[in-house]
């Protein structure tokens, strides 16, 4: 459990200058899930809603400096790991995880395969990511990445994917989230498969939209935040799945980019702000400027601070 009211969540991942994926999506997701987000950059990615243009990987020494800057100053409640780029970066992150307390939950989103099916990592780096799986609490591969991890064919339905995940969860001694969003089905259920073979499924319906850029980053970051807040795997996945479904529902309204746009990470707070303007309460901007114009309450204020509160409330104390 976090010591403060907000779990402090570190994202270790690449970037997205258009804000839909990578650390930019991570920070918004962490905030939406009730956490305080921090990030360490593994790779600078020139991408937008239409695709990736180029990737620049800073020296691993700079990655080390970023990690040291965080851990020297901030107590971490949860970690989310995204794009690792190469074997050297993966090894450095693995070393960093060994320095964390055992009760800090770590979520790995193994970015290994592009939506097109292209492999993003060299064979050595893929093996390093496989090894890293045994150091984390839970992994969130898409179906293509699950197939790469297990050296199997890509699953054609959720039940087949769950069976494959059971194999990897047992072998790597880590929980595996199976994501049904890429399946050709009216449902988009997720499931968490534990090393003991138990499965907890979370129902979700498919949303008819092309704007799903960064959904993997967003789900894993929200999941890490809820785990950092003390939720169980099942409770964290349930919250994150339902939140992400709503974010996808509201994605089209953002109108960001010409390709596959981002989801609306802050849809809940946006709706609250819009609703606030319709509440039946007085307009209070002038209350503090001219308190003498506000009716005095029937009971005299006990002091200046109480008087100030009554003035701000516009005398609506009943």
Segment roles from a protein language model:
Residues 33-38, 198-200, 226-241:
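Phosphate-handling active-site elements
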Residues 19-35, 297-303, 307-312:
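N-terminal basic/disordered segments at the start of proteins
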Residues 2-11, 23, 31-115, 262-272:
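Conserved N-terminal subdomain of the carbohydrate kinase-like
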Residues 6, 54-57, 235-317:
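Charged C-terminal helix
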Residues 24, 29, 147-148, 210-233:
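Short, small-residue alpha-helix embedded
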Residues 122-199, 208:
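Conserved phosphate/ATP/ADP-binding segment of small-molecule kinases
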Residues 12-18, 199-213:
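Short pre-catalytic strand/loop immediately N-terminal to key active-site residues, enriched for Gly-Thr
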């Amino acid at each position: 459990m976090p010591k403060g009211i907000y779990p402090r969540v570190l994202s270790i991942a690449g970037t997205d200058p258009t804000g839909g994926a990578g650390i930019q999506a991570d920070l918004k997701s962490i905030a939406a899930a009730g956490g305080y987000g921090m990030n360490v950059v593994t790779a600078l990615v020139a991408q937008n809603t239409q695709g990736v243009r180029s990737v620049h990987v800073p020296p691993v020494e700079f990655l080390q400096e970023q990690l040291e800057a965080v851990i020297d100053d901030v107590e971490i409640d949860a970690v989310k790991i995204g794009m690792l780029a190469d074997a050297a970066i993966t090894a450095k992150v693995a070393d960093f995880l060994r320095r964390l307390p055992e009760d800090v939950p770590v979520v790995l989103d193994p970015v290994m395969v592009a939506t097109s099916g292209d492999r993003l990592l060299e064979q050595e780096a893929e093996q390093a990511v496989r090894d890293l799986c045994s150091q984390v609490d839970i992994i969130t591969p898409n179906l293509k990445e699950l197939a790469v991890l297990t050296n199997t064919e890509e699953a054609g339905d959720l039940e087949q994917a769950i069976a494959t995940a059971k194999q990897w969860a047992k072998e790597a001694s880590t929980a595996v989230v199976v994501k049904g969003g890429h399946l050709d089905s009216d449902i988009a259920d997720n499931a968490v498969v534990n090393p003991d073979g138990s499965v907890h499924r979370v129902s979700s319906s498919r949303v008819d939209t092309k704007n799903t850029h960064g959904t993997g980053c967003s789900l894993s970051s929200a999941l890490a935040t809820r785990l950092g807040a003390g939720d169980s795997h099942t409770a964290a996945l349930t919250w994150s799945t339902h939140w992400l479904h709503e974010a996808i529902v509201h994605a089209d309204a953002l109108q960001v980019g010409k390709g596959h746009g981002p989801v609306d990470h802050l849809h809940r707070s946006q709706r609250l702000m819009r609703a606030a303007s319709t509440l039946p309460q007085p307009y209070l901007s002038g209350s503090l400027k001219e308190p003498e114009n506000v009716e005095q309450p029937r009971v005299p204020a006990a002091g200046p601070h109480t008087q100030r509160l009554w003035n701000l409330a516009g005398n609506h104390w009943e």
